[in-house]
């Protein structure tokens, strides 16, 4: 069996980039198999190293899949839209910067668009919430599940977004960007914000070399990339009210969501979170344990960060490395 190993730069103090590395692990495990991964901090620029079956760069395989993927939402048996447990109807404003108003976006049928709902008897929580329905990412007969925000187990769901946005809508924007409603003379509206799909077409070489470092103005996101974070200050200016996009990475955002499918960082107290990286190749199952800080008797580095509040949203901040006792 042929195996291919590739590496990309990673900022170990960025929770989003470490979670996105987990996303590459999870996606490559489904798409290719034979996955082992680790972090290499022997040089000034740390790297994330990924090995998978086959003769193609595993990062390229994952990014290409995501550039073509379509979304389906999952609902439990008996799900009723607008039920008592369905959605956040408090009417409070979500403070995510640059989020387009409802009705201002195009619903073109393109990669990344929601293609309907699938009823499943195996639902991760007791009732469905329209703002937190699990999704499938589907392309060429293969699919990835993204459902951490709907986790009804005792495990921390690590859902950071809030307000009247849905997981599927945010995922759609991270993949296919945001377009305005087309005018009468247009077949499609102008592009407000780029997603992974546009970046793959326009900056493929850069994405393959440094996928976490290609940033673009974004509106609402899952709040994993701390470069896109902001908190409200009483200074007479808000990127939300001004509708300015803040530069961050849709690649980090969607891959971090995928990376949380089977793993969680350790939220050891309210809004205080720990995670770890490991320096020896591990299969996905052990990598998930290592992320949460399990002592695997391997070279490891541990980090801690705070979740700040931005309106009703939680947002990541850059981490500090914990000193070893």
What is each residue range found by the language model?
Residues 158, 165, 175-182, 188-190, ...:
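Extended amphipathic alpha-helical scaffold segments
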Residues 188-194, 198, 202, 206, ...:
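Short, functionally important secondary-structure microenvironments
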